[in-house]
Amino acid sequence: MATKKKTEKKVVEIFSTQSPNEAEQIAFQAQIKGFDVHFNAIVGGYCKVRSAVLDKEDAEQMVEKLAEEGFTANLLSI
């Protein structure tokens, strides 16, 4: 019986800010450029712009593409 290899999942976080307006603008700009990102609600006093949960390789590629477009992004383990 074949066992399914568990792939490592990551979240791409583009930006954290205390300004909801700033976070929404960043999410909007990234969406215009074709990135699947969304504005997260305020967590611990910070607004977050994140992408969905991705396989590690996909997340790393997204961070590279975001960097090419001028966005700073971090990989978060989950």
PLM-predicted stretches and their roles:
Residues 5-8, 18-48, 52-78:
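Extracytoplasmic
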Residues 1-2:
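Pro/Ala/Gly-rich low-complexity, hydrophilic intrinsically disordered segments
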Residues 13-14:
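Targeting-peptide/extracellular-domain and disordered-appendage signature
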